[in-house]
């Protein structure tokens, strides 16, 4: 077995939700109480879905993406797994903006070190990962760590071991 783990970035490696909350507060928005359980930002902020998606796009194209902190204990466990021979690839729906992508890559390397064999953070969050996963990983027996149920299911359907 190839000891490879495919990783989502936001909510797995980086605490995107925390950084987005800080940024939204700076834009004058306040998250609704007891909304941690929601993945959908329109529900977390009580705003129209189109407005939420527009705000996500602005955030994902901002310099903030170069400074998102690590998610919980992700650095500790990625380092441990790397030290026992696991390899990692990162697939992320950030934005098509090349500067935002470079900031994301630099932030990942700054936080985790040079542990990633491949990083693609240029997927459009409005499109998703289904076709990309199919094209790149179909038939592979890799682990797939993803915080979105829809994306995790897309990986499972092509043979990845979704966690």
Feature-to-residue mapping (PLM):
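A short, structured active-site edge motif that brings together acidic residues
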Residues: 89-96, 105, 111-129
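Short, acidic loop-to-helix structural element flanking the phosphoryl-transfer center
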Residues: 51, 57-90, 97-102
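Short hydrophobic segments within beta-strands
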Residues: 8, 91-93, 145
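Conserved Lys-Pro-Asp/Glu-containing loop-to-beta segment of HAD-superfamily phosphomonoesterases
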Residues: 126-156
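Short catalytic/ligand-binding loop motif for oxyanion handling, primarily in non-cytosolic enzymes
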Residues: 14-16, 22, 88, 97-101, ...
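Anion (oxyanion) recognition and catalysis
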Residues: 25, 79-83, 156
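Active-site neighborhood of HAD-like aspartate-dependent phosphohydrolases
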Residues: 1-53
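A structural signal for isolated positions on well-ordered beta-strands in alpha/beta enzyme cores
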Residues: 87-89, 143, 161-163
């Amino acid at each position: 077995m190839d000891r490879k783990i495919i990783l989502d970035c936001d909510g797995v490696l980086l605490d995107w939700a925390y950084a987005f909350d800080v940024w939204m507060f700076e834009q004058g928005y306040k998250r609704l109480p007891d909304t941690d359980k929601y993945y959908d930002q329109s529900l977390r902020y009580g705003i129209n879905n189109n407005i939420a998606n527009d705000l996500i796009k602005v955030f994902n194209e901002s310099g903030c993406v170069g400074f998102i902190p690590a998610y919980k204990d992700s650095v500790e466990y990625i380092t441990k797994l790397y030290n026992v021979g696991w390899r990692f690839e990162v697939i992320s729906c950030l934005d098509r903006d090349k500067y935002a992508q470079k900031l994301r890559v630099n932030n990942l390397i700054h936080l985790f070190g040079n542990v990633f064999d491949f990083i693609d953070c240029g997927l459009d969050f409005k499109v998703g990962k289904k076709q990309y996963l199919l094209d790149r990983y179909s038939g592979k027996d890799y682990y797939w760590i993803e915080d979105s149920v829809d994306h995790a299911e897309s990986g499972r359907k092509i043979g990845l071991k979704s966690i």
